[in-house]
Amino acid sequence: MSESLVVCDVAEDLVEKLRKFRFRKETHNAAIIMKIDKDERLVVLDEELEGVSPDELKDELPERQPRFIVYSYKYQHDDGRVSYPLCFIFSSPVGCKPEQQMMYAGSKNKLVQTAELTKVFEIRNTEDLTEEWLREKLGFFH
């Protein structure tokens, strides 16, 4: 018997927070970490972080539970230019409960579309989230 894919809606206050985050003027790294409220079947805010490096962000993620992250990253280009790409990172660690993984996987695209993001990455181990990994991923876009 196969379970139908659950697609969770995005909480209204989170939609507004993501919209504001997209147009923020600050020049430091920042992150919005989101989780699924499985009773409400809603993607909700877990925590907001300011001035956080990829390595510090990694330390905030649970090792056995999925999370969605929207990360504003100060990207220093080789030619000296600076940009602030918004990255969507789906943290789906090995060892999560299968039903939890399916709920997050089923809701990922809706959240990406809601947040209007194009730089979408996935990690299967929170330890993979490093500055080097992120710069390598962003290198494909710049």
Swiss-Prot record:
Cited InterPro entries: ADF-H, ADF-H/Gelsolin-like_dom_sf, GMF
Alphabetical list of SMART domains matching this protein: ADF
UniProt PTM: Phosphorylated; stimulated by phorbol ester.
A Pfam family that the UniProt record links to this protein: Cofilin_ADF
GO BP annotations, alphabetical order: actin filament debranching; learning; locomotory behavior
SUPFAM superfamilies: Actin depolymerizing proteins
Keywords attached to this entry: Acetylation, Growth factor, Phosphoprotein
TM helices/strands, residue ranges: none
ADF-H domain mapped to chain residues: 4-139
Residues bearing the modification N-acetylserine: S2
Single GO molecular function: growth factor activity
Free-text function comment from the UniProt entry: This protein causes differentiation of brain cells, stimulation of neural regeneration, and inhibition of proliferation of tumor cells.
Family under the similarity heading: Belongs to the actin-binding proteins ADF family. GMF subfamily.
Protein name per the record: Glia maturation factor beta
Organism: Mus musculus
